[in-house]
Amino acid sequence: MKKRSYLSILVAGAMCAGLILSGCSSEGGKEPADSNSPAPQVSTSPESEYPDQAAADNVAALIDAIYVQQRTEDTDAQCTAAKEAWDALTDAQKELVSGEFADPDYFGRDTGDASLDDPRNQDDIGENELLVVSFGTSFNDSRVADIKSIEDALQAAYPDWSVRRAFTAQIIINHVQARDGEYIDNMDQALERAVANGVKNLVI
């Protein structure tokens, strides 16, 4: 009887010791907060972390938007926006421009003096028109030497006819317009111009 009571006391004591140790272990795992610990880092967006690249990417997106074959009612404004955004970049930012079609050469490459060209998009055509149609080129020197020289020769040979120009590549038209501020008609625009001017004899 005494032995059983002694055994019960030992078991009860062991259980109490286990509970005490368990409580100490769980409390000991919690460290007091350090008032001097740094505040958690706040994640930053790529735009705020890399502002130069963000500015360059914006220009690349604007260039890609006008590197298309379809002209819309927004094309003129898009061309202007792309050039203004490019002009606002630093030289270092311009080197970062890269898109599906965009690169620093789109605005940065020197292809000659665009002011030497004549887009031949004037009204007052008269009744007779020679419409010179080509794919076109955005290289200013080549456009002056090749396309313009042919148009000038035709105008000299046929003084009673008005020589006008149309490009079939809207991508090139947009490029020249955005970069140099030169407006060249596409085929639809050229034909609409002929109708608006009352042209009766049109040779393409």
Model-identified regions with their sequence ranges:
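Compositionally biased, low-complexity segments enriched in small residues
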Residues: 4, 37-40, 59
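Bacterial signal peptide processing site
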Residues: 25-28
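Active-site-proximal alpha-helix that buttresses catalytic centers in soluble enzyme cores
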Residues: 46-49, 105-203
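Core hydrophobic alpha-helical transmembrane segments of single-pass membrane proteins
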Residues: 13-17
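C-terminal motif of bacterial Sec signal peptides marking the signal peptidase cleavage site
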Residues: 20-23
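Intrinsically disordered, low-complexity proline-rich regions
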Residues: 31, 37-41, 45
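Bacterial N-terminal signal peptides that target proteins for export
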Residues: 2-10
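Beta-rich interaction/scaffold domains
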Residues: 42-110
